[in-house]
C-alpha cells in the first residue's frame, strides 16, 4: 500500500514538467468542523441573502451597499473595521443593507501579492493551509458580530471553504468572460455581481448573467476534498456592476440609463450596482467621494436604476507598500487605495439620505 508521501510523488510520463512541487491542502470539511458557523451567523447569512435577493428583484427599496477594504491582509484591523461598520449598519438599517467587503483573493493583471489565502504572512511563503484557516476564522468572527460579508470568487475550490459565510459575491472584470466563473456563479448560494469588462463594455457581463442563470456541470471538489462533478440549478440573483473602463467612468446618469436599456432588452429589471472605485474613480481613492455625490443625486432624484453600490474603504485612507523591515501602518490597504473611516461615515450618511429623498419623490 502506498504511503501518503508516495501518493504525492506519483510520476506520469510527460506530465508536471514545469511543476516544482505539490503540497496537499486540508479538505474543506476539516475547516468547516474546526470553525463551524454559529446559529447566529447562519441566520445572518440567510437573512442577508434574502434581503439582497429582494433588493435585486425590486421588492425592497433599500440600497445594497458592499463596503470595506480592497483586500484583507491584517485580520485584527479587519475585525476592528467590522466593529465600526456594525454601528453604521444598525444606524442605517431602514435605508441601507450594508455588507462588508471581505476579499481574500486578488486577481492580478501580471504578478503581485495574491491575497491572504494565497500568502497569509505577506512574505512569499505561500502557506495556503494557514491562509484558509485564517480566512475562515475571520469570516466566523465578522459574521458573529452581526456584520454580513461579501467576497470575490476566483476559483472553483476555495468556495467550499468559505462560501457558507458569504452573503454576496463578485466575479471581477478580468474573470467575467471566463466560462468556469460563470458556471461557478450558477451554483453559488448567494447573489453574484458581474463587473463590466476592463474595456468598459457591458456585453460580457450581460452574457455572464445569462450563462449563470442556467444550470451547468463542472469539475470541483466535495467537502471531503474528493474530485467531483458539480451539477448546478442556476442563479437568479445575478446582476451587473459598473466599474468604469479603459475609456473612462460609467457611473453618470446617461451611462447608467444606456446600460439599463440594454438590461431591459434582455427581459430583466433595468438596474445596476455602481462601483465607486477602480476606473470610475480613475484609481484615485478620494474621487470615490465625487462618484458618491453624483450617484446620490441620481437616487435622490427618484431614479430606481441604481439598486446598489460598492465602496473601497478602510480605517486609514490611502495605501502603503510592503517594505521589508518597515512596520505597516495599521488599518491601511496594501493593495488599492481606500477612503478612510471619516469619509466612510460621510458616504453612508449621504447614501441613506439619498434613499430617504427617493422615497419622498416616488411617494
Report residues per predicted region.
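Active-site-facing alpha/beta catalytic cores
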Residues: 2, 9-16, 82, 95-251, ...
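N- or domain-start disorder-to-order transition segments that initiate the globular core
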Residues: 17-56
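Conserved phosphate/anionic-ligand binding catalytic regions in large, soluble enzymes, centered on
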Residues: 64-77, 336
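Conserved, mostly hydrophobic/aromatic
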Residues: 68, 274, 340
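N-terminal intrinsically disordered, cationic/polar leader segments
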Residues: 86-87
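A contiguous, surface-oriented mixed alpha/beta subdomain in the mid-to-C-terminal portion of proteins
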Residues: 243-245, 250, 258-273
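Internal helix-turn-beta structural module
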Residues: 314-359
Amino acid at each position: 500500500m502506498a504511503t501518503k508521501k508516495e501518493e504525492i510523488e506519483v510520476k506520469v510520463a510527460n506530465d508536471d514538467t514545469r511543476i516544482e512541487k505539490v503540497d496537499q491542502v486540508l479538505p474543506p470539511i476539516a475547516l468547516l468542523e474546526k470553525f463551524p458557523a454559529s446559529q447566529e451567523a447562519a441566520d445572518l447569512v440567510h437573512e442577508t441573502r434574502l434581503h439582497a435577493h429582494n433588493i435585486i428583484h425590486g421588492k425592497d427599496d433599500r440600497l445594497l451597499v458592499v463596503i470595506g477594504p480592497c483586500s484583507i491582509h491584517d485580520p485584527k484591523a479587519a475585525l476592528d473595521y467590522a466593529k465600526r461598520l456594525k454601528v453604521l449598519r444598525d444606524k442605517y438599517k431602514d435605508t441601507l443593507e450594508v455588507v462588508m467587503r471581505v476579499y481574500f483573493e486578488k486577481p492580478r493583471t501580471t504578478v503581485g501579492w495574491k491575497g491572504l489565502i494565497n500568502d497569509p504572512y505577506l512574505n512569499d511563503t505561500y502557506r495556503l493551509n494557514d491562509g484558509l484557516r485564517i480566512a475562515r476564522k475571520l469570516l466566523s468572527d465578522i459574521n458573529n458580530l452581526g456584520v454580513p460579508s461579501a467576497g470575490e470568487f476566483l476559483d472553483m475550490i476555495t468556495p467550499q471553504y468559505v462560501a457558507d459565510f458569504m452573503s454576496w459575491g463578485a466575479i471581477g472584470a478580468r474573470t467575467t468572460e471566463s466560462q468556469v466563473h460563470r458556471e461557478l456563479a450558477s451554483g453559488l448560494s448567494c447573489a453574484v455581481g458581474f463587473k463590466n469588462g476592463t474595456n468598459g463594455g457591458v456585453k460580457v457581463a450581460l452574457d455572464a448573467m445569462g450563462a449563470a442563470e442556467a444550470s451547468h456541470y463542472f469539475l470541483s471538489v466535495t467537502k471531503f476534498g474528493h474530485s467531483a462533478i458539480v451539477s448546478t440549478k442556476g442563479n437568479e440573483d445575478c446582476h451587473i456592476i459598473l466599474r468604469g473602463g479603459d475609456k473612462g467612468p460609467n457611473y453618470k446618469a446617461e451611462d447608467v440609463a444606456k446600460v439599463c436599456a440594454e438590461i431591459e432588452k434582455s427581459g430583466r429589471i433595468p438596474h445596476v450596482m455602481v462601483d465607486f472605485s477602480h476606473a470610475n474613480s480613475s484609481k484615485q481613492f478620494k474621487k470615490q467621494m465625487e462618484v458618491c455625490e453624483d450617484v446620490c443625486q441620481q437616487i435622490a432624484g427618484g431614479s430606481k436604476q441604481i439598486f446598489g453600490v460598492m465602496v473601497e474603504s478602510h480605517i486609514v485612507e490611502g495605501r502603503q507598500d510592503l517594505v521589508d523591515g518597515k512596520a505597516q501602518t495599521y488599518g491601511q490597504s496594501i493593495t488599492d487605495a481606500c477612503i478612510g473611516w471619516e469619509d466612510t461615515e460621510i458616504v453612508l450618511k449621504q447614501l441613506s439620505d439619498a434613499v430617504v429623498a427617493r422615497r419622498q419623490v416616488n411617494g
